[in-house]
């Protein structure tokens, strides 16, 4: 079966960099060099890495959102990994940095999103890069500008681990920028699986089938299967594996949060909880 590519993309998976202050300080240093040299260019105000291009519609957002969370859940952190930025150069009309260390993350995102039936990646080879600025046509034709850009030096590393402020986001092409970030459709901290921890080994220790209808009413339609056996399997599986759907239900269902906090359920009204939500 032929693979569909996002050669006319309308969204992308974003790895924002503004929250890494040390990197941004050095990144802006490069931009100041360009301006001081008088290079006619448009400065990038939201530093980032585009990890995958997408050709999707709003009805695909949820599938891509879930795929991102599954990639995060399946990451094997070890001691973390490093992202290396180096070699300022011209790529097309842009001045960019080479980016190394995110190739596996790119591949995982492409495969997980594609497994959801969504169109992603491009037919041309993906090149990890971080845009510094975009040159005007006039600036690109000036040999002195090209020579200056090719002489620039940059070498910086970021270590990514579960406590890092690293995020994966769905962004629409042309989205507005504010304070160094793109407006996002969805955004997930890459260490999110450690944000909430299931309080018991088994879901059955704090609630039962009697709770499913209460929880279902607080979720979006279709989140939990209508069949109680299927719904229980889905919820308990994600609860016991501390994966994305557990956190989704924890965020959306106040009843489920209280059950986790109390280590017990109240679906039959046997007690009044003394625990208040934060």
UniProtKB/Swiss-Prot annotation:
InterPro entries: Coronavirus_NS2A, NS2A-like. Belongs to the coronaviruses ns2a protein family. Coiled coil: none annotated. Pfam families: Corona_NS2A (PF05213). This is Non-structural protein 2a. It comes from the Viruses.
